[in-house]
Amino acid sequence: MAASLRHMAHFQKALLVAKTAPRLSTIVRATSTLNDGASKVPDHSMHFKLERLWAVGMLPILPASYFIHGPVMDAVLTVALTLHIHWGIHGVVYDYARPYVIGEAAAKAAHIGVYLITGLLLAGLLHFNTNDVGITKAFELVFSL
């Protein structure tokens, strides 16, 4: 009988805890429209179109840089290549270095790294253009081999 009373007391305590503890499967009612989630995501279609237009715009610059040498063409080619490479690397990092995949700190470091790489690329190309033969003359020298 004593064991039965102990079990009954234990059962009553468990029942009391179960009544006062929050439920894990509580139904939460939420009202939403269909476009609520979609409005929070930025639209990258315009950026994608701009990248494609930029790439198409680079098509005449590359052959022209073989025939036209000088600081202006070097600067145009430097800016065009730097932006094209930056957008490409940024797209890869944006797609594959998301915070929920690699962690918040690593994702932030990857995005900062994109801008560091772009800055170093721009500085290196500008240094090459001003202190050496320049990009267009370098292309001519490479193709003359």
UniProtKB/Swiss-Prot annotation:
Membrane-spanning ranges: 53-69, 76-94, 109-129
Pathways per UniProt: Carbohydrate metabolism; tricarboxylic acid cycle
Binding positions for heme per the UniProt entry: H84
Mitochondrial intermembrane side of membrane: 70-75, 130-145
Keyword Iron: yes
Pfam families on file: CybS
Cited InterPro entries: CybS, SQR/QFR_C/D
Predominant localisation class: mitochondrion
Keywords assigned by UniProt, alphabetized: Electron transport, Heme, Iron, Membrane, Metal-binding, Mitochondrion, Mitochondrion inner membrane, Transit peptide, Transmembrane, Transmembrane helix, Transport, Tricarboxylic acid cycle
An MF annotation (GO) of this entry: metal ion binding
GO cellular component: mitochondrial inner membrane; respiratory chain complex II (succinate dehydrogenase)
Complex formation: Forms part of complex II containing four subunits: a flavoprotein (FP), an iron-sulfur protein (IP) and a cytochrome b composed of a large and a small subunit.
Family: Belongs to the CybS family.
Descriptive protein name: Putative succinate dehydrogenase [ubiquinone] cytochrome b small subunit, mitochondrial
Species of origin: Caenorhabditis briggsae
Lineage: Eukaryota, Metazoa, Ecdysozoa, Nematoda, Chromadorea
Gene (UniProt): sdhd-1
